[in-house]
C-alpha cells in the first residue's frame, strides 16, 4: 500500500484549511458560549434558591452585635452618631448600619432587606457589565462568555454565605458604586 501526497502551494493550502475550519471553530465557540451561559444561569438559580431556603427568621449572627444599640434606640438614648462610628475599629459603614436598623424596624431583623439590597446590587453590577459589553466591538459569543463569567462570579454558590451575612452588603454596595462611577466617567464626553 502506498500513499501519494499532492504538493500544493502553501497559500492555497492555508486558505483551504482556514475556509474549511472556520465554520467548525465558530460552531464550537457558539456551543461553548451557550453551554457556559446555561451553566451560569443554572448556578445562579441554584444560588438564589439556596439563599432563600437558608435565610431564617430572626437576626442573623452579625445583627446580634447591634442589639445593644437597638435597645438604646428604643429607650430614646441612641443617636445618629452611632452610624458614623468605626465598626470593629476599622471602617465606617453608615449605609449598612442604617440598613440593619431599617431591616429590624420593618422586617423584624430577619435580614430580608440586606439580602434584597445585596442581590439588587449584584443585578445592577451585571446590568452595567452588559451595557459596557454592548458598546464594545466584540463578537456575540465573546460577549456571552464574558457576561456568563461575570454572572458566575456575582452569583456563584460561594456567594450564598455573603448574601446571608448582612455585614457583607457593604461590599456589594461599594463594588456597585465604584463600577457605576467608572462607567459614568467613561461615558463623559471629555
Residue ranges with predicted function:
Residues 1-47:
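Start-transfer (signal-anchor) and selected internal transmembrane alpha helices
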Residues 45-66, 160-162:
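Helix-to-loop transition at the C-terminal end of transmembrane segments
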Residues 53-54, 103, 133-134, 155-165:
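Juxtamembrane "helix-exit" motif on the non-cytosolic side of transmembrane helices
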Residues 54-59, 72-98, 105, 111-116:
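Membrane-proximal lumenal/periplasmic loop motifs of glycosylation machinery
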Residues 57, 88, 113-117, 159-173:
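Membrane-embedded glycan-lipid processing machinery
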Residues 116-140, 180-184:
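Transmembrane-helix motifs of polytopic, lipid-linked glycan transferases
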Residues 133-156, 176:
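Transmembrane-helix signature of polytopic, membrane-embedded enzymes
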Amino acid at each position: 500500500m502506498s500513499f501519494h501526497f499532492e504538493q500544493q502551494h502553501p497559500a492555497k493550502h492555508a486558505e483551504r484549511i482556514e475556509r474549511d475550519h472556520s465554520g467548525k471553530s465558530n460552531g464550537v465557540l457558539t456551543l461553548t458560549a451557550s453551554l457556559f451561559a446555561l451553566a451560569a444561569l443554572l448556578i445562579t438559580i441554584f444560588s438564589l434558591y439556596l439563599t432563600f431556603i437558608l435565610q431564617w427568621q430572626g437576626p442573623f449572627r452579625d445583627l446580634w452585635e447591634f442589639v445593644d444599640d437597638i435597645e438604646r434606640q428604643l429607650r430614646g438614648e441612641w443617636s445618629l452618631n452611632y452610624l458614623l462610628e468605626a465598626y470593629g475599629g476599622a471602617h465606617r459603614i453608615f449605609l449598612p448600619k442604617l440598613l440593619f436598623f431599617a431591616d429590624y424596624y420593618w422586617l423584624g431583623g430577619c435580614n430580608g432587606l440586606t439580602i434584597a439590597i445585596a442581590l439588587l446590587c449584584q443585578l445592577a453590577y451585571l446590568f452595567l457589565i452588559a451595557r459596557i459589553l454592548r458598546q464594545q466591538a466584540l463578537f456575540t459569543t465573546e460577549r456571552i462568555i464574558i457576561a456568563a463569567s461575570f454572572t458566575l462570579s456575582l452569583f456563584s454558590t460561594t456567594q450564598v454565605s455573603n448574601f446571608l451575612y448582612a455585614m457583607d452588603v457593604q461590599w456589594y454596595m461599594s463594588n456597585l458604586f465604584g463600577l457605576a462611577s467608572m462607567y459614568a466617567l467613561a461615558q463623559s464626553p471629555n
